[in-house]
């Protein structure tokens, strides 16, 4: 299949195996959920009745006081007592096989092509870290909300984009399913596209 390079108006031949797949919604959903779950801290913790201090001695004798029987001052029904079913730190990460992850990424890229949300440019560099210059370049392509994908780190591009809402910059190695589906457009350079094709082949 062929994709048009927007700034040179030339056609670029790309693999149908990577950019012409059918959309697998279930697999993409699984990849997105797994990625987001991996970002959860899972550090919350509460104290149960075995964690709170005190509670060794029986507060009063079992019978004769007229009060309800009690064995510890750290019972969950007491003030300052332990929490019932206390939260513990846990790992939320989900395992997703490499083969499934790559298939999900192929599916996402194919859908981006189908929806005309993948914008290919020959190169996308800015001479200086100026937001104004980047805005002009994006405006020339008719893009306002986009993930810019490059083949290597570009400090000027990153500094120019970091103050723009709805614009982010990523290298091919840092791509993730959430970023790809979360922007209106994915602006990708030809070298980066070749890297993606090689990675997902």
Curated annotation (Swiss-Prot):
Record's keyword terms, sorted: Ribonucleoprotein, Ribosomal protein, RNA-binding, rRNA-binding
GO biological process, one term: translation
A GO MF label: rRNA binding
Region (Disordered): 43-69
InterPro entries per record: Ribosomal_uL4, Ribosomal_uL4-like, Ribosomal_uL4_dom_sf
GO cellular component: a single term: ribonucleoprotein complex
Family: Belongs to the universal ribosomal protein uL4 family.
Quaternary structure, from the entry: Part of the 50S ribosomal subunit.
Function: One of the primary rRNA binding proteins, this protein initially binds near the 5'-end of the 23S rRNA. It is important during the early stages of 50S assembly. It makes multiple contacts with different domains of the 23S rRNA in the assembled 50S subunit and ribosome. Forms part of the polypeptide exit tunnel.
Protein's name in the database: Large ribosomal subunit protein uL4
Biological source species: Thioalkalivibrio sulfidiphilus (strain HL-EbGR7)
Taxonomic lineage: Bacteria, Pseudomonadati, Pseudomonadota, Gammaproteobacteria, Chromatiales
């Amino acid at each position: 299949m062929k994709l048009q390079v927007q700034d040179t108006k030339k056609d670029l031949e790309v693999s149908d195996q990577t950019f012409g797949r059918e959309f697998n919604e279930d697999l993409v959903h699984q990849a997105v959920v797994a990625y987001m779950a991996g970002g959860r801290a899972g550090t919350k913790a509460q104290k149960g009745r075995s964690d709170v201090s005190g509670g060794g001695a029986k507060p009063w004798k079992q019978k004769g006081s007229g009060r309800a029987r009690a064995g510890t001052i750290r019972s969950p029904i007491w003030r300052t007592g332990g929490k019932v079913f206390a939260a513990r730190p846990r790992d939320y990460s989900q395992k997703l096989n490499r083969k499934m992850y790559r298939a999900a990424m192929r599916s996402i890229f194919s859908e981006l092509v189908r929806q005309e949300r993948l914008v290919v440019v020959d190169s996308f560099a800015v001479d200086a870290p100026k937001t104004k210059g980047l805005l002009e370049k994006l405006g020339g392509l008719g893009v306002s909300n986009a993930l810019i994908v490059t083949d290597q780190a570009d400090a000027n591009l990153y500094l120019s984009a970091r103050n723009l809402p709805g614009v982010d910059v990523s290298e091919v190695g840092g791509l993730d399913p959430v970023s790809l589906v979360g922007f209106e457009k994915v602006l990708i350079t030809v070298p980066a596209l070749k890297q993606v094709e090689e990675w997902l082949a």
